[in-house]
Regions:
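ABC ATPase "signature
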Residues: 217-218
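Conserved ABC ATPase "signature" region
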Residues: 100, 104, 111-129
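Conserved catalytic motifs of ABC-family nucleotide-binding domains
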Residues: 154
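Catalytic Walker B motif of ABC-type/P-loop ATPase nucleotide-binding domains
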Residues: 158-161
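Helical segment within the ABC ATPase nucleotide-binding domain
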Residues: 173-186
């Protein structure tokens, strides 16, 4: 079995009396596409935010790439990529400029920067639009650019929070074609949240979450 790259034990997040995440235990293995499936308000985004160090757990332990998310959040952030649920690109910049800014923030060496940007634009089939302002992109193109940006600093793990939310079925399928190619070429582990049942079929394993608790874990076939 591949090594564990994400581990949570008794993970809890409370907001006053509201328990958004209620004692989650999970393990994700290297190279997996792991899906977090559940309705809105189930605790998916709260969990992913704790694993990405954007929220501090109320209780429990979480390790990402072997690193405690509370004790060394900066080291965790260097090893992960994150594609947010809401758009976070600068529409006034070009595709290349958005990636250049991200590469600078993550201290990607200047000698590597141009090569990596070209590689990711090519992998996401955006090379011909590298010099176009992002405001001219379709929703699917913007999502592909966000994925390219999330992979630019070569993370071990890519977190995707509702990666195809608001996209039409054909565009959603295209995004998953690109994600599978990315996993195949880069060996990245993908942890994604979704409330689309059909999207869970793309995952190696799924955890179903409801009211802040994991109610089932298994392959798509096992959970049918």
């Amino acid at each position: 079995m591949a090594p564990t790259v994400i581990e949570a034990k008794g993970l809890v997040k409370k907001y006053g009396d509201l328990e958004a995440v209620a004692g989650i235990d999970l393990e994700v293995h290297a190279g997996e596409i792991f899906g977090f499936l559940g309705p809105n308000g189930a605790g998916k985004s709260t969990t992913i935010s704790m694993l990405c160090t954007l929220l501090t757990p109320t209780a429990g332990v979480a390790r990402v790439a072997g690193i405690d998310v509370v004790h060394d959040p900066a080291a965790v952030r260097q090893r992960i990529g994150l594609v947010f649920q809401d758009p976070s690109l600068d529409d006034q910049l070009t595709a290349r400029e958005n990636l250049e800014f991200h590469a600078f923030i993550y201290s990607v060496p200047a000698a590597e920067r141009t090569r990596r940007i070209a590689e990711m634009l090519d992998l996401m089939q955006l090379a011909d639009r590298a010099s176009s302002q992002v405001k001219t992109f379709s929703g699917g193109m913007k999502r592909r650019l966000e994925i390219a940006r999330g992979m630019l600093h070569q993370p071990q793990i890519l977190f995707l929070d509702e990666p195809t939310l608001g996209l039409d079925p054909q565009t959603r399928k295209s995004i998953w074609t690109h994600l599978n190619e990315l996993r195949g070429k880069k060996g990245v582990t993908i942890f994604m949240t979704t409330h689309y049942m059909d999207e869970a079929e793309y995952c190696d394993r799924i955890a179903i979450i409801d009211h802040g608790k994991i109610v089932a874990v298994g392959t798509p076939d096992e959970l049918k």
